[in-house]
């Protein structure tokens, strides 16, 4: 943060000021100007089969390339969840025809700029600030997506116009959206520049048939070309008109699920210049403020002399908050937020804190080591290509002592099934997790060397452990 008075943002002077002294959380909404000027308040997932153009669409709308890692660029696939924020603007001159009156820009663009359309005056004004969660498309990475989906308000389902619909992962992702109870979906028929008009129409019929009876039934289908940025402003218009602004809770104690964490210090840094670890995640509820005392659970996990699990929550203080390159004084629920802390950076490096929960001291949920869940299994394995007209493999029932992968919030951990009834199961977790009764979890099983989604469950109750807190 640039110097000056504490509690007032001074970085990016062209954006709206945030002042902690005058902050009244009861008056905030997901469209409050001082919030959307600097951070996203709506999360939209991009889902669909591999190489159907999910990352390209995000880049066309936000200008940010979500493929950040070298091995991802070379293989042209997204492995970690990518995030990109975009501001959506609407021209205030009503004589401008739709969809030209909508425009999208990166998150550090000023909140208002003059029209550059010939013959039309007026200003483009900021109406939404959205965050795209670019989900990996491969089925092994399905778990990553269910983790990311813990914080999605809507989804863009991408279908490539030059392949038949549906492709295996398209159906697997639709199933994941149903599990997540996402109601708001836009279907984008991409790569429209590569096919004849008749092919596009034929595929449009295929898409309609495919989504019938699913959550995506009745969703708008927009033909686009992400590479040529064709029809992108139509997507912006639909995001504004069709995706309702989610109801958010600004007044509860804040809680953030950590999806990324890193050490920002360069090697060879002087001791006095060391910065604390940074945790990145999406705030589920409440407002985090610079200077606030925080707690991270489960914290440091170890075993005592008898081999029993112990958790020692980490206590720290927020020294900075940011959304992409924008400094914040306070952060609200919505897009990905970076939280600069005073935590020992080695605890944060290379995503070590993923799956932890950060929030106000003493207000976080319990830490569980065993869960009792009510669960539902899918009838068939999703996304497996089957030879000829054989149906996809059936999902076998849960068996006692088998090991599953359990996804809770942003944590993926192993779990051994210790008891199982018709629709109730007990699972002993490999890693303790901070969660609460009623949370949804996803279950995956190893099938032919890959983790495949087999069902989901809801936490009924469980065995919790008391965190160890140093008596200082």
Swiss-Prot record:
Disulfide bonds: none annotated. Residues 134-137 are annotated as: G3. The modification Phosphoserine is found at residue 16. One of its GO terms (cellular component) is eukaryotic translation initiation factor 2 complex. It catalyses: GTP + H2O = GDP + phosphate + H(+). PROSITE patterns: G_TR_2. Pfam families: eIF2_C, GTP_EFTU, GTP_EFTU_D2. Keywords: Acetylation, GTP-binding, Hydrolase, Initiation factor, Nucleotide-binding, Phosphoprotein, Protein biosynthesis. Residues 39-247 form the tr-type G domain. The keyword Acetylation applies. One of its GO terms (biological process) is positive regulation of male gonad development. Residues 190-193 are annotated as: G4. Its EC number is 3.6.5.3. Member of the eIF2 complex that functions in the early steps of protein synthesis by forming a ternary complex with GTP and initiator tRNA. This complex binds to a 40S ribosomal subunit, followed by mRNA binding to form the 43S pre-initiation complex (43S PIC). Junction of the 60S ribosomal subunit to form the 80S initiation complex is preceded by hydrolysis of the GTP bound to eIF2 and release of an eIF2-GDP binary complex. In order for eIF2 to recycle and catalyze another round of initiation, the GDP bound to eIF2 must exchange with GTP by way of a reaction catalyzed by eIF-2B. This is Eukaryotic translation initiation factor 2 subunit 3, Y-linked. It comes from Rattus norvegicus (Rat).
């Amino acid at each position: 943060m640039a110097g000056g008075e504490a509690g007032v943002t001074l970085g990016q002077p062209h954006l709206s000021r945030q002042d902690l002294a005058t902050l009244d959380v009861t008056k905030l909404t997901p469209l409050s100007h001082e919030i959307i000027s600097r951070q996203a308040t709506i999360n939209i997932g991009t889902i669909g089969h591999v190489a159907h153009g999910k990352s390209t669409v995000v880049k066309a709308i936000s200008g940010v390339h979500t493929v950040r890692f070298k091995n991802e660029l070379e293989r042209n696939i997204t492995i970690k969840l990518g995030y990109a924020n975009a501001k959506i603007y609407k021209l205030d001159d009503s004589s401008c025809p739709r969809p030209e009156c909508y425009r999208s820009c990166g998150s550090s663009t000023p909140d208002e700029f003059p029209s550059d359309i010939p013959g039309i005056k007026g200003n483009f004004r900021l109406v939404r600030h959205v965050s795209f969660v670019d989900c990996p498309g491969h089925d092994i990475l399905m778990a990553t997506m269910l983790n990311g989906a813990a914080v999605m308000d809507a989804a863009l389902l991408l279908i490539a116009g030059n392949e038949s619909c549906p492709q295996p992962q398209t159906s697997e992702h639709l199933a994941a959206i149903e599990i997540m109870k996402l109601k708001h979906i836009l279907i984008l028929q991409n790569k429209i520049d590569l096919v004849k008009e008749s092919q596009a129409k034929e595929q449009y019929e295929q898409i309609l048939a495919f989504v019938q009876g699913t959550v995506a039934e009745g969703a708008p289908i927009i033909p686009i070309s992400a590479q040529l940025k064709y029809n992108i402003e139509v997507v912006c218009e639909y995001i504004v008109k069709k995706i309702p602004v989610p109801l958010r809770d600004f007044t509860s104690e804040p809680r953030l699920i950590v999806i990324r964490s890193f050490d920002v210090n360069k090697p060879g840094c002087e001791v006095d210049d060391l910065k604390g670890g940074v945790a990145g995640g999406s705030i589920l509820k409440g407002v985090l403020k610079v200077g606030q005392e925080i707690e991270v659970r489960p914290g440091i996990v170890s075993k005592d002399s008898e081999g029993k699990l112990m958790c020692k929550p980490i206590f720290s203080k927020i020294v900075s908050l940011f959304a992409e390159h924008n400094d914040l004084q306070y952060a609200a629920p919505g897009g990905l937020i970076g939280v600069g802390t005073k935590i020992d950076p080695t605890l944060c490096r290379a995503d070590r804190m993923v799956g932890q929960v950060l929030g106000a001291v003493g207000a976080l949920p319990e830490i569980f080591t065993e869960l009792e869940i009510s669960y539902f299994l899918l009838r068939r394995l999703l996304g497996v290509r089957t030879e000829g007209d054989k149906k996809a493999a059936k999902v076998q029932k849960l068996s006692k002592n088998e090991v599953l992968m359990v996804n809770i919030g942003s944590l993926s951990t192993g779990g051994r099934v210790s008891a199982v009834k018709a629709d109730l199961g007990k699972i002993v977790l490999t890693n303790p997790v901070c969660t609460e009764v009623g949370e949804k979890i996803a279950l995956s099983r190893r099938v032919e060397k890959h983790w495949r989604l087999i069902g989901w469950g809801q936490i009924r109750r469980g065995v919790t452990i008391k965190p160890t807190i140093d008596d200082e």
